[in-house]
Amino acid sequence: RGLGDVYKRQTLKEWQNVGYMARVNYNYANKYYLTANFRRDGFSGFAKGSKWANFPGVSAAWTLSQEDFMQNVIPGLSFLKLRGSYGLTGNQSIEAYATLATVASGYTWYDASSLYIYQNSLANEELTWATTKTGNFGLDFGFLDGRISGSIDVYKSKTNDMLLNRSLPYMTGFSEAKFNAGEVMNRGVELSLNTVNINGD
């Protein structure tokens, strides 16, 4: 018994991610710390003019417990550090050809041997990187030579230009398309506490 006509389809997608990063660390007298970093990322899936984006960041810390004026100020205090940071990160969570109008093939419902080509997505060359800005301020502390230690962190992050699917009017002939349309903000406080109840030394 014959199997009928056999059709073969192939799909090929190609894209490229490239990233460059540089970082500089500075430490003075084990008291003052400064770190600066810079990242440049590229994604071939974006249109010309939007393929590359820059994401800098900076952080600083101050070990207060190393300062003379902090000695014997707080009973039992063995370590105290203030720190802060601010930086940008990027996200390119789209498919390889999301900025282009793409086509697909199909068969007519009345004649399976008739092949036709149709446009199945809209172009949006304005798509660009989603960017998250994050700031953090923290305090690390230790008491009794580290038998009690912990940290307090206050953070806030905001993501702009999130890459989301947005519904389109029926008259366009498409149900949805990708846009830089989302925004989300996170903020909070994190606490941690560690204790050494039994020291075997």
Walk through the language-model features, giving the residues of each:
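Extracellular/periplasmic, surface-exposed regions of secreted and cell-surface proteins
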Residues: 1, 5-201
